[in-house]
Amino acid sequence: EVRDDVPPGAGKFRGGSGVVKSQRYLTPGFMTHESDRHLDPPWGIFGGKEGAGGKMEIHNIHSGKTRSEYSKFSGMRAEVGDVVSYYSPSGGGYGEPLDRDPAKVLDDVLDGFFGPAHAESDYGVVLKPVDDGYDWALDEEATKILRTKMRA
C-alpha cells in the first residue's frame, strides 16, 4: 500500500510516496531484512525538500507489543502472530516547492498524498473546505499573499 504516515519530499516536482509492505508469521521462523535510508532520508535537490526515512516495525497481534528494528539484520527470530512491516523511504523533491503549480498541490491533497496543512506550510498553497469539509478548493488570493510572504 502507499505510505500515508509521512508526506513525500516537497518540490516543484514532489518526491514519490514510499510504500508499506507487511507480512504475518503463522508459524515460528527466522527472517532476514536489508534496506537503506532509515537514518539518512533521501535528499531533495535544487531547492526541493528531503523525503522521509524508511523504518521497520514488528507488531505482535497476540501481545499487542510493537518494536522498531534496524534496516539490516539476519537470522532474527519471528514468533507466531508477528506482523513485520517495512516502510520504504519517500523520495526527495526536485526544485523549489513554492514553484509548484497550486492546482497540482490541490490535486495532491485530493489524491491523499498529504493534507491541507502540509500544502500550506511547505508549498504556500491555501485551501478552503467545501462540501462540509469532505473536499477542498484552492484559495487563489490567499495563496498569492502567502507565497509572497514566504519568498520574502
Ranges and model annotations:
Residues 3, 89-94:
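Short, charged beta-turn/beta-strand-edge "cap" motif at the junction between a beta-strand
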Residues 1-62:
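Long, charge-dense accessory insertions within large macromolecular proteins
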Residues 51-89:
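Generic long, charged, amphipathic alpha-helical segments
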Residues 32-35, 66-70, 93-98, 116-118:
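Extended hydrophobic-aromatic, low-complexity segments
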Residues 42-47, 96-97, 127-128:
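A short, polar/proline- and glycine-enriched secondary-structure boundary/capping micro-motif
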Residues 14-16, 49, 77, 87, ...:
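Active-site-proximal structural scaffolding
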Residues 98-152:
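Intrinsic disorder at enzyme termini
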